[in-house]
Every structure is written in C-alpha cells, then in structure tokens.
C-alpha cells in the first residue's frame, strides 16, 4: 500500500501554522460537545446542558495538560527533563491518551465536587463521546506519519516517510477503526438501545473495558516507542497502562447501580 503523503500543516499565516493534529483536537471537542448535548436531550440525566457547557473548560485543560504530562513522564522523560521548554511544544505532537484520560478524570472530579454532581453521572456522558476524539487523533497521527506499526510482509504494509523505509503496519488506522469507530458504535448501541445511562458507572465501565482490550490487541502491531522499547521482553507501555483500565472497567460494571 502507498502512504498518502499529506502535508501535516493545513495552512500557515506568518509564524502561525494550523496542523491536522491540532485541528483533530478542536473538531473532536466540538463534535463531542454536540453529541453529548444530544444524549442529554434524549435521556435527561442528572447532568444538564449548562453543566456540560461549564465542564468544557475543565475537560480541555485536563486533556491538554494530562495528555502532555502523561507523554512527558511516561514515554520520554529524559528528553524533556533536559529541555523543559520542549514540554510546551505540543504542536510537535506527543500526547498520551492514558495521561489525557487521567487528566479528564481529575478535572471531572474537581468539577463534580464544586457543583455537587454525581461523578459517574458525568463520566457516563463523557464515555460515548471520547471515541470521536480518538478516531480523529489517530487519523492525524497517520497523516503525520508517526506512531506507525511493526515491520510486515502483508499487503497492508506501508512505507512511512519518517521510518526506516521498511513496510510497516498502519497501526494508526487500526486504532482509528477499533478505538474510534467500533467503540463509538458499541457505546452508542449501549446508550440508546440498552439505556445504560440508567445505571451509574455502566457506560464508563463499558468504555474502559473495550478501549483496554482494543489497545492491548492493536499494540501487537504497533512499533514500541523507541526510547522505551519492550518491557519484560514482550509488553509495551500502552499494554501495561491498559491493564488498570480493564480492571477498573470490570469493577464499575459489577458495581453499577440503578439511578
């Protein structure tokens, strides 16, 4: 397969450059906000549209700060400790989903404590929305030619411009499909068909379990981060960080209570 060599920069005006990567965050947040509002309109949960509007600022800060610090601390601490100013260069890429997820969880906790809202009631609204951002983010990773997969002889192999010119799995597209499209459909089906919002924590648990399973499986095709490599000979950082999500998701489903 031929890699579609797309310019990572959409357009630039003087020193200001707009990239597909940054656009994926903006569009993901806007589409997520729209979709969450539709869910609130239909099911009338404890969370109101006004609550959601107020939470957006918390969520954006949680995503950016958590995602960036997660990448810095978990994937490449030596580089950023040597050059702390590089931490601010988010336009170069380098965001961790697990860090971003933790950032949003902390933001949601602080928001719920301030406004006296049930924490799981908020995360159950967030869960069906997240796959939208995951899909767009992985497509942006693909356009950037980063986070590509392992070497393969299969017909799916692509030669990425920033790699060693060996055909590799387009693992970004695998993640976009499973963690984005498939997970979105699973949660939409659960939310609208099985009315999972009637039980605190059920949507959150479903998201955590399926994301973790998809991530663990797709990491088999994804090249480990060069600065980390394999852990315990065969595991990747993404797989290890997904195990707590799997356990927490199982707990939330088992403990989910009717509202």
Curated annotation (Swiss-Prot):
Q: One Pfam family name from the record?
A: LGT
Q: Name one GO cellular component term.
A: plasma membrane
Record PROSITE patterns: LGT (PS01311)
UniProt-recorded Gene Ontology molecular function terms: phosphatidylglycerol-prolipoprotein diacylglyceryl transferase activity
- Binding, a 1,2-diacyl-sn-glycero-3-phospho-(1'-sn-glycerol): 138
EC identifiers of the protein: 2.5.1.145
State the annotated membrane topology for this chain: Multi-pass membrane protein
Provide the GO biological process annotations: lipoprotein biosynthetic process
Q: Which UniProt keywords apply?
A: Cell inner membrane, Cell membrane, Membrane, Transferase, Transmembrane, Transmembrane helix
| Localisation | Cell inner membrane
Q: Transmembrane ranges? A: 9-29, 55-75, 92-112, 117-137, 172-192, 201-221, 228-248
Query: What does the record give as its pathway?
Result: Protein modification; lipoprotein biosynthesis (diacylglyceryl transfer)
- Predominant location: membrane
General function of this protein: Catalyzes the transfer of the diacylglyceryl group from phosphatidylglycerol to the sulfhydryl group of the N-terminal cysteine of a prolipoprotein, the first step in the formation of mature lipoproteins.
What's this protein's family per the entry?
Belongs to the Lgt family.
Which NCBIfam families does this one have?
lgt
Recorded hits in HAMAP family, A to Z, give: Lgt
What's this protein's name?
Phosphatidylglycerol--prolipoprotein diacylglyceryl transferase
Organism name: Rickettsia felis (strain ATCC VR-1525 / URRWXCal2) (Rickettsia azadi)
Q: What is the lineage of its organism?
A: Bacteria, Pseudomonadati, Pseudomonadota, Alphaproteobacteria, Rickettsiales
